[in-house]
Amino acid sequence: MAFDELATAVTEPELDTHEPTVVEWSGDGLLMIEVDWSGERVRVQLEPEATRSWTAEILADRIARLHRLALMRARAEQRERLNEGGLAIETTAGFPSHADVDEYRRTINF
């Protein structure tokens, strides 16, 4: 048995299934979201100042919005990798383009 950086037990199959992840930070650096393209691996990091200065509603909204951005970017990158491998996956809501990601990123104002 192995342990991850938070001393959580990690089984051997989990060690072998690491997909590429993407990380998105809030502009103020108080919130970080890391996800893989499937959305199964998620890591959230909050700096102490976030819990002191944001209400629960603001925190929930910011986590949801930054998670969406990170997942969109991860899926855009996965679509690109698959297409480079010979598939022809069209841009969809589930597999957005990088332009779609950039457009959504402009709505993140925190």
Could you say what each language-model-derived stretch is?
Residues M1-M32, R43, P48-F110:
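Acidic, negatively charged sequence signal
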